[in-house]
Structure formats: C-alpha cells, structure tokens
Amino acid sequence: MSCKTPPTLQELAENSLLKNQDLAISALDDIPSLFFPSLFKKACRNRYVGIIKAMVQAWPFPCLPLGAMISRKTAYRRILEIILYGLDALLSQKVPHSRCKLQVLDLRVMPLKLWNRLPVFGTAGCSENPAVVGHSGTEVKQPVKVLVDLVLKESPLDSTESFLVQWVDNRNGLVSLCCCKLQIWAMSMYYHRKLLEILDLDSVQELRMYCISNPVCLLNFAPYLGRMRNLRCLILSHLWQTFSMTPVEKQQVITQFTSQFLKLKCLQILHLDTVFFLEGHLDELFWWLKTPLETLSVIDCNLSKSDWFHISEFQCTSQLKHLNLKWVKLTHLSPEPLRVLLLKSASTLTSLDLEGCQMMDSQLSAILPALRCCTQLTKFNFHGNYISMPILRELAYNVVKQKSQQSKIRFIPSCSHHSGLEFEAISQPHIVFVDVDRTTGEQEQVLFYAICSGEYVL
C-alpha cells in the first residue's frame, strides 16, 4: 500500500484561498511573494478569472513567464485573454498596486518545470530601470514588454497570434511586442506587414530566413532588416528565383537588401546556405558589413571568382573564430583567398570546416603555412577532399604536432570492413586531421582516421 504525501502548509493555505475568490484577492497584499507562482498556476488550471486578473495587477516579480504554462492551444488562448484583460486594468491605473513589479510578459515556450525556479521570474529580457526621467523631470513609465518567438509563413497568423497583435496595437504604446528569435519561411508581406510594423525590431537578436523563392519579398523586407539594430545572428537558407527578372531588376533587389547590412553593427554570426539568388553578389553583402564577424558559414554555394577573391578583403572577415565552407567546391578556384583569410584570422580562428570542398594536393599545400599560424585552431573538418598520403602526413605532423608537442595522437581505421587488407597496411600512419579536443589542464587528444592506400575522397 502506497502512502500519499500529506499536503504542505503552503498547499493547504493556497487551496483555502482558491475556495473564496474575495478572500484570495484581498490577501494578495499580504501573502509572501514565493506563494505567487504556485497560486497563479493553480488559479490558471481552474480558470479562476477574477483571481488571475488580480494577481497580474499585483505580480511581485519583473517577469511573468506564461510560456512555461503552454500545454494545450485552446486552454492557452483563454488564459492569455484573461491575463491581457488583467494587464489592461493594470495599464489603466494611475497608481499601480504597491506590490506590482511586472515589466515583462514572457510568452516564449519553455518547459513547465522552469515555472518552479525563481530565476525565470527575474529581469531577463527587461530593462534594469523600469522608469526613465522625462523632460519635465517626472518619471515616465516604460511600456510593458510582451516577449514572443515568431515563425512567419506564407499563411496568415493563427487566431491567438492575431489576437495578440491586435491587442498590442490597440494599447497606444503602453505595450511593446518583442521577439528575440524570428523565423521566416516563404513569408507573405500581405499577411505580415502589420506585425512587422508593430514589432519592436530592436528586440530581434536572431533572424532565420528559409525558402524565399520570390526576390520581391527580400525587397519588401529590406527596410525591416535594417531596423534590427541588435541582430546578432542571421541565417539565410535556400534563397532562389523562380521567375525571370531583368539584370537591372535583380540588381535593385540585391542592392536594397544587402545595403541594410551596414546598419547591423551587432551582427556576430552569419550563415549563408544555398543562397543561389545572391551568387555572384556576395562581395556586395560583405562590403556593406563593417562589423567583424565571429562566425561565417558559406555552405553549398557556387561561388563566383569575384565572390571568392573578395571574401578575404573585407573587415567583416578579419577576426573570425569559426569558418565553415562546407560543400563549397574549390577545385577550380585559387587557394590564395583562403590562405589570406586564414592568416587574417590566425590569432582568433578556433574551428575550420572544409568538408566536401574537393580540394587537391596543390591547394592544401598552398594553405599549410597559413594553417600553421592558426594557433587557436581546435577543430578542423577535412572530410571530402582529394589528398595524397604525403600531404596528409605533412598536415598531421607539421600542423597538429606543432600546436602541442604533448598531443596524444590516436589512429582509427576508416573502414569497417578490412577484407583482403593486411593489418600492417591498415596500421600505417596514413592520417587525416579530423578533430582536436582541448581540455583545460589535461593532455590534448588529436583524433585521426587511418586510410588504407592511394588517393581517396575522405
């Protein structure tokens, strides 16, 4: 027979309050702040509308993380409406409740278990100073922030999102709609222009744009991109053109879009994945970007000679920590831009990914001196290149061992099936530098794959 754990005194007190709405509301002045999260969760679960509204107006923490309570869409919509009505009452008060510290309504989805952790009710996403001094010397109350993560598609917003946008729009500046992470999938400006006008674009820190087949979308979206002054991460993936444009029209779109990068002074991470529409014009994008990047990924793109020769010339590529050129075919391109790029970032580069670049012996030999200068390099992916054994040995022993004479080198067979091969042949030091894991205070481990013989796509 299992023994049921008896309720705690706090649980008994909360259950008693919830049975009497008037008593619960009147007690909000006196109950400990630590009771609020648990009491609020129970009130939402049982749809105690009056108690929920009153608790919002007396919320003793800077943040109300409602997103942690999202479980069922229909239930969430109803709870959200109740809370927004409570916020309406709070915003209309000339003198707010003495306990109220609410600055942020966080609607971002997060695990429910976080609800019971007090840090989630802290000041994340909100200003340290909830009020500023106006020209008259009196305090001006800052707007309440509503935090969301948005995914925009070709279809309209769902009913809950539409309701929220309309509610914010009707608050006349008393509420600010903020979005830290914005995803756009084949966006339709017809449906989303109003949202972009209302959204506090300064709040966007990460922007992902996928599957944009209509370049006009880039043209229309460009002014909004330029207003994302705190953007740190930008991912552009699968941008292509499905209808014909004159060269003049295409250049107009590209210029309007890439010129916005001049305003992205906080950008640290730039991922360009299969951006067919920008091929041959990436030099324009890099020219406008004046801030040094930490991460640059150019993946599966057919770089023009102009793109390739200019990539190392600009300030934005001078202090890279991570460089990813995966599946960019370099076979017929000069290794000189890559050599210059490595030298410029030699003191900062920690990871280099050249997987699938189909480089040849001569190209790797050309960049080896620059690789030796990359003293911080800890991860190097060279899978998918045509390299002979002598060059592999030079790469492993002259580059890797130079980084630390105490590195531990391990040889791992690259083939799971060794039929017909002599063990001695497999164990020869035919190696590829795959990864270096640095552990503070411990011996470095350098991982290699053994190659049986001849030239291979590794």
UniProtKB/Swiss-Prot annotation:
InterPro entries the record matches: LRR_dom_sf, PRAME, PRAME_domain
Presence of the UniProt keyword Kinase in the record: no
Tissue specificity: Specifically expressed in testis (at protein level).
Keywords, comma-separated and alphabetical: Cell projection, Cilium, Cytoplasm, Cytoplasmic vesicle, Flagellum, Leucine-rich repeat, Repeat
Coiled-coil parts of chain: none
GO BP, one annotated term: negative regulation of DNA-templated transcription
Protein's UniProt keywords contain Repeat: yes
Stretches forming LRR repeats: 99-126, 176-200, 201-227, 228-263, 264-289, 290-321, 322-340, 346-373, 374-398
Subcellular location: Cytoplasm; Cytoplasmic vesicle, Secretory vesicle, Acrosome; Cell projection, Cilium, Flagellum
Subcellular location, principal: cytoplasm
GO cellular component, one term: acrosomal vesicle
Similarity comment text for this entry: Belongs to the PRAME family.
Database matches in PANTHER family: PREFERENTIALLY EXPRESSED ANTIGEN IN MELANOMA-LIKE PROTEIN 1, SIMILAR TO PREFERENTIALLY EXPRESSED ANTIGEN IN MELANOMA-LIKE 3
Biological role stated in the UniProt entry: May play a role in acrosome development and also in sperm maturation and motility.
Name used for this protein in its record: Preferentially expressed antigen in melanoma-like protein 1
